[in-house]
Amino acid sequence: MSDYEIRRPSHVNDIASIVYDLSQMLIEPGENVPSGIYQWCGLQPLTKYDMVKSMAKVFNLDGNHVKGVKEPSPGAPRPFDTTMDTSRLEDLNISHHTPFEKGIEECLQKWRN
């Protein structure tokens, strides 16, 4: 399991809230009318291995059988770090971040025993 490339997972509810906030600014325009491209990513830098460990915790599983690999993943080249520049949204005071462990617990809740 890759413990090398950095991901910045975003919760779908955070993305929905950002889209809502931007649309509200278009419906009720003030001095900041959004236009152009906006980027978003989660705050937590995580590898796939980190995410699997969080999922194991949600299911109360050991997870020690999964081993992290500290080298680039084989196959198609992937960026080392997927962090995006979120400053345009932050300049509009738009910022929604669900911690990964909380978000993954919510998403996987129906599969828990």
Where are these regions (language model features)?
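Glycine/small-residue-rich pyrophosphate-binding loop that anchors the diphosphate of NDP-sugar donors
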Residues: I6, L43, F80
